[in-house]
Amino acid sequence: HETLDINYFGTLNCIKAIIPIFRKKGHGRIVNISSLGGKIGTFGYAAYCSSKFAVVGLTDVLRAELKPLNIKFHLVCPGEFESPMVDELNTYRTEENRIVTQTVPVLPLDVVADEVIKGIEKDRYLIIPGVIARFLEMSSRWFPSISRVIIDFQIGRVYQGPK
């Protein structure tokens, strides 16, 4: 529950708080932060990915529902970037998780920030920092069966089972 409370319900509560202000102004812009894990499931992160998939779904729906009110949405889905959270994750990753996540390089925070700002300035709805992350998201959307086979193969090479 805690992960959903923070990632999904925290996002929803912030949106609920700002909508009356944007209605009064006649326009607004909301930038929701999900994750590459909200677009592509990641081994070992069921709760996290589920909560971030929920943010993606919420943002997709509200983008359409609130467009008539001139409220724009941006959905940011970064992969891992230099942060205390990633440092902590590295202390307890399973081998299965490590093999899957090493596909996408950990980005410097300033690169992520620059790409997010540029995406907002260019009025992009979906902002995925990093070329490799964008490629993986696109390929998993266009060729989901192939993506699943590749991930299953990678995990199968190192799978150790439940601990």
Where are these regions (language model features)?
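Active-site helix of classical SDR
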Residues: I15, S51
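SDR active-site lid
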Residues: P68-V131, V149
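Active-site Tyr-X3-Lys motif and surrounding loop/helix of classical short-chain dehydrogenase/reductase
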Residues: H1-D5
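Residue(s) in the substrate-gating loop at a strand-loop-helix junction
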Residues: S35
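Active-site-adjacent segment of SDR/Rossmann-fold oxidoreductases
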Residues: I40, V61-K72
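A short helix-coil junction within the Rossmann-fold of NAD(P)-dependent oxidoreductases
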Residues: A17-G26
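Active-site loop immediately N-terminal to the catalytic Tyr-X3-Lys motif
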Residues: I40-A46
